[in-house]
Amino acid sequence: MLILGGSLGAEPLNKLLPEALAQVAPELRPEVFHQAGKNHDEVTAERYRAAGVEAQVQPFIKDMAQAYGWADLVVCRAGALTVSELAAAGLPSMLVPLPHAIDDHQTRNAEYLAREGAAFLMPQRTTGAADLAARLTEVLMQPERLDNMAQAARRLAKPGATHDVVNICLEVAHG
């Protein structure tokens, strides 16, 4: 399981995930690679140790393609680039939108993936460790569900989007 908090980290995720994973039965716990953000890795690693959960914690991931290739499930925020990457990589996800994002755009992004079966929307305001642990347990006991979510994510990918946008801009510019 890959946990992403962005280059600055997402402190709510850094606190929530160790606590939630501690509530998942040890035999179900996935391997954990947690990108905690600059200056948050040591505290986050200590939270995992205190919770009795093994995790590799780093401040930053230099090779996202490799990290995505390794992951079977991603827990992260729901920024536009992130959800695009999840779709392109065909990865199931649990999305915890930034609650104070402008126009609540991260929730809209997460709702899109969730509605199509590629993600679970886990609102930060209402998702506690027990809620997340229950959802994790549910999907970890049903690997076929993760496979279905991955297929749904792949269907949502728009690998030619840059080309399409350039063509639209050229059409508008040249009338």
PLM region spans:
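Short Ser/Thr-rich beta->loop micro-motif in glycosyltransferases that lines
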Residues: 59, 77-81, 97-101
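A short, well-ordered alpha-helix in the C-terminal region of glycosyltransferases
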Residues: 145-159
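Two-component system phosphotransfer/interaction surface
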Residues: 127-141, 170
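Acidic donor-binding loop of glycosyltransferase active sites
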Residues: 69-84, 91-92
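Donor-nucleotide binding loops and adjacent catalytic segments primarily
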Residues: 1-76, 107-111, 115, 122-132
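C-terminal alpha-helical cap of glycosyltransferases
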Residues: 158-175
